[in-house]
C-alpha cells in the first residue's frame, strides 16, 4: 500500500490479518480505512462530513459507499463473526474460563420526521426506552456479546424491524450460528429475552441461562400455581429459605425457589428485595438459573456480569458515535453499525497485558498521529510543496 496521509499502516495490517483484503476491492478497503481512521479520531461525531476530512473524496462518496456501494458487507460480517468466535472460544480453551453470551437491545434516538418529509429515515419507529421510561423514536439495535476472561467482543448487531422478525427469533437465529461451547458457559439476558425457546436454543450449544425474570411469571411452590409477584407478598425475613446476600456493595433479602415454572421444567428462581426495602411495592426483582447446582451467591454474581453489555453500549455511543449517524437507508445504517463493530474489535485486539477497548482506542489514535507526522516529515525531505501539505492537513 502506498504511503498516504489518508491511510494507516496499522489499520491496514489489522484488515489483512483477518483476511478482509482478500474479499473486498482495493477501493472498498480504502473507504473502510477512511471510516475506521475517522472513528478513532478525537472529536468524531458520526457524521459523513467527519469521514470526508480523512479522505480525498467528497462526503457524498462515503455516503454512497454506505448506502448504495457495491461491496459485500455480508462477507465482512461473516469474517468479523468468525474472528470473534476464534478469539473468544480460543481464550476459553486456553484458560478454561467460561464463555458469557450476553444479549440486550438499545435505541439510537432520532427526531421524528414531519408527515410531509420526502425522504424519512428508513425502518425508524417508536420503541420503549427503559432508560427514558417512555416511547422513543429511532432505530433499535439487538446486540449479542461474547465474553471470556475479561475480553468482551460484539458478535452481532441486528437492526430490529418488527415486520420481519421478533427479537426472540433474532436471538434464536444467532444462537443457532454459534459453535458448541468448549467449556461450561452461560447465556445472560434481562427479562425480555427469558423465554423457553431462547433458553433451549442456547442449551443446545452448551450455554446454561442466568437471567432476570418478570414478576408475572408463574411458579409452582408446593404444586400451587402462582405468579412470582403474588407469591412474594407472603415472604418474611424469618422464613427458612430467605437469606441476606451481598452483591457488590449492595445487600438483598433473597428467597430461593427450585422447581418448574411456565416454559421451564426445572430451574432456580431467586426473589430479591433490597435490604432496606423488603416488601415495598415496586422493589421486587426476580432471577432465574437453569443450572440448579449454582448457589444463590453464584447466580447473583454471575448475573451482575450482564452489566458488560451496558458498558459496551455506553462506550460505542460516546466514543464511536453508534447512535449519531445521519444515514437514511436501512442498508447504510446496518453497514455503519457493522463497521462500528469492526472498529471495536480492532481496539480489543491490540496486544496488551490487559486488552481493553479504551487502551486500543488510545493505541490507534497515537499510531495514526505518528504515521501522519512521519508522512509529513518524509514528504518534506523529498521537497514536497508546503501549500500542498497544508491542504492535506487542513
Predicted features by range, described:
Residues 324-375:
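Basic, amphipathic alpha-helical segments enriched in Lys/Arg and hydrophobic/aromatic residues
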Residues 48-51, 97-111, 144, 186-194, ...:
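Short, conserved catalytic/metal-binding motifs centered on acidic residues
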Residues 158-273, 353-362, 369-374:
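An internal, acidic/charged active-site-proximal segment
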Residues 35, 282-306:
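Extended, non-catalytic structural segments that build the interaction scaffolds
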Residues 1-74:
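Gly/serine-rich nucleotide phosphate-binding loop at the start of the catalytic core
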Amino acid at each position: 500500500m502506498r504511503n498516504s496521509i489518508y491511510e494507516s499502516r496499522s489499520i491496514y495490517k489489522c484488515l489483512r490479518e483477518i483476511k478482509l483484503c482478500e474479499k473486498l476491492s482495493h477501493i472498498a478497503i480504502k473507504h473502510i480505512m477512511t471510516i475506521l481512521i475517522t472513528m478513532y479520531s478525537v472529536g468524531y461525531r458520526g457524521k459523513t462530513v467527519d469521514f470526508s476530512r480523512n479522505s480525498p473524496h467528497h462526503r457524498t462518496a462515503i455516503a454512497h459507499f454506505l448506502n448504495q456501494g457495491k461491496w459485500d458487507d455480508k462477507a465482512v460480517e461473516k469474517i468479523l463473526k468468525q474472528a470473534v468466535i476464534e478469539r473468544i472460544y480460543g481464550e476459553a480453551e486456553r484458560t478454561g474460563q467460561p464463555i458469557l453470551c450476553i444479549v440486550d437491545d438499545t435505541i439510537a434516538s432520532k427526531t421524528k420526521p414531519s408527515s410531509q418529509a420526502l425522504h424519512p429515515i428508513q425502518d425508524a419507529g417508536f420503541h420503549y426506552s427503559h432508560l427514558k421510561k417512555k416511547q422513543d423514536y429511532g432505530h433499535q439495535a439487538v446486540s449479542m456479546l461474547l465474553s471470556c476472561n475479561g475480553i468482551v467482543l460484539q458478535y452481532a448487531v441486528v437492526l430490529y424491524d418488527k415486520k420481519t422478525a421478533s427479537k426472540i427469533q433474532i436471538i434464536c437465529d444467532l444462537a443457532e450460528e454459534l459453535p458448541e461451547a468448549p467449556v461450561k458457559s452461560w447465556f445472560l439476558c434481562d427479562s425480555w429475552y427469558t423465554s423457553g425457546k431462547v433458553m433451549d436454543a442456547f442449551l443446545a450449544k452448551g450455554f446454561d441461562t442466568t437471567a432476570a425474570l418478570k414478576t408475572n411469571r408463574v411458579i409452582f411452590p408446593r404444586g400451587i400455581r402462582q405468579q412470582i409477584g403474588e407469591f412474594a407478598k407472603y415472604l418474611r425475613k424469618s422464613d427458612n429459605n430467605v437469606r441476606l446476600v451481598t452483591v457488590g456493595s449492595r445487600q438483598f433479602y433473597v428467597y430461593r425457589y427450585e422447581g418448574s415454572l411456565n416454559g421451564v421444567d426445572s430451574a432456580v428462581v431467586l426473589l430479591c428485595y433490597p435490604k432496606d426495602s423488603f416488601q415495598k411495592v415496586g422493589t421486587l426483582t426476580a432471577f432465574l438459573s437453569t443450572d440448579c447446582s449454582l448457589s444463590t451467591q453464584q447466580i447473583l454474581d454471575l448475573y451482575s456480569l450482564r452489566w458488560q453489555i451496558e458498558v459496551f453500549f455506553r462506550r460505542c455511543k460516546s466514543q464511536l458515535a453508534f447512535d449519531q449517524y445521519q444515514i437514511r437507508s436501512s442498508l447504510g445504517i446496518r453497514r455503519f453499525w457493522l463497521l462500528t463493530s469492526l472498529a471495536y474489535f480492532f481496539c480489543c485486539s491490540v496486544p496488551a497485558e490487559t486488552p481493553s477497548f479504551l487502551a486500543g482506542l488510545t493505541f490507534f489514535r497515537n499510531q495514526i498521529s505518528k504515521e501522519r507526522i512521519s508522512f509529513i516529515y518524509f514528504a518534506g525531505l523529498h521537497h514536497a510543496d508546503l501549500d500542498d501539505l497544508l491542504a492535506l492537513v487542513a
